[in-house]
Amino acid sequence: MDKIKVFFRRVASGSFKRFFRNLELVHEESGKNRIVLFVDMVYSMFRYGIGYLDYMTFGFAYIKRDKRLTFMTMDDNIAMVRRLNQRDSYEVFDDKSVLYRKFKDLLKRPYVDLRDGFEGFAAFMEGRENFFAKEPVSYGGLGVKKVTVDGRDAKEIYEELMEEKLFLAEETIVQHPEMKKLCSSSVNTVRVCTVVSDNGNPHVVYALVRIGSGDKAVDNISSGGMYTLLSKDGQITHPAFCDKTVTYYTEHPATGFKLIGFQIPYFEEAIALCKQAALREPTMRYIGWDIAITENGPVMVEGNNLPGYDMPQNHRFHDDGRGIKEDFEYAISH
């Protein structure tokens, strides 16, 4: 009975319209009968605990029970967060002002909290043509604004940002020229998911690169960007997926730049930075780190205490049709 309630709650939360839209997309991609797919989607909810979005992302239309059991589900992910991350430490990652203080040396760029007063902001502004302002608590690329000084008075900008509650001002990250080839209008970040084992060892479970769409200054998936899984040595080996267009790209749609074979600069250093960061807050053992790559190496953008489980399990990134649940289990136990 509980699973029936969960099923209808999840369908209703995304709307029946979206449910059938996804059903149609899976039908078009797989060529399978709509009724068969509908029944299997409902069955998968009860048997494996996945919603219709994950059904499409994981490619469940193409695989059977043994491989379906290798996937991390939403419930698995929530259970892992509850097990590995202590709620009273969430603020470290929910509030960027707290995060920035904790990991200041890994940010590797100056920033200022406007709530500390105008004088600090005025000093930060000296000689700057632009910078980024952020809400301390915001998600998905929202609450972020690129500020162009353009001769304006520092006091005017300060009051404007205070009014908009964009309390954090930080130096604009200038990404590595190679990373700029992916998309020049946004800083294209690497998402590195770390798990600290029961023995205190940091492990990288997966790494993704997120690429801007070309018309916004952020690379977030919710803002129209795309993503793809990286190989162990930091290469793009599979097409990038865009949720907004429900399309896989081997070339960037705005520039035509070929994605397959691209090597992330300073990838080893980025992994080392994330492992270092993973050990800094012992009560938060499961974190997704957003890393930017500059000419001088990797810098931290932010950390997330609810890392995604779905993106790294996109079926187009795994030729063997398997999920990464075993990778998480290994990381926890070793």
Identify the role of each PLM range.
Residues 128-130, 187-191, 204, 286-288, ...:
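Extracellular structured ligand-interaction cores
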Residues 137, 171-173, 194-196, 211, ...:
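Short, flexible loop/turn elements at secondary-structure junctions
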Residues 183, 187-270:
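ATP-dependent carboxylate/phosphate-activation module, predominantly the ATP-grasp catalytic core
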Residues 10-123, 274:
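Conserved N-proximal alpha/beta basic substrate-recognition cap immediately N-terminal to
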Residues 79-199:
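Active-site nucleotide/adenylate-binding loops and adjacent lid/helix of ATP-dependent enzymes
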Residues 140-143, 201, 215, 310:
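Short catalytic/ligand-binding loop motif for oxyanion handling, primarily in non-cytosolic enzymes
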Residues 17, 249-275, 279-286, 293-334:
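C-terminal active-site "lid" helix and adjoining low-complexity regulatory extension at the edge
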Residues 1-54, 196-232, 299:
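Internal hydrophobic scaffold segments of catalytic domains
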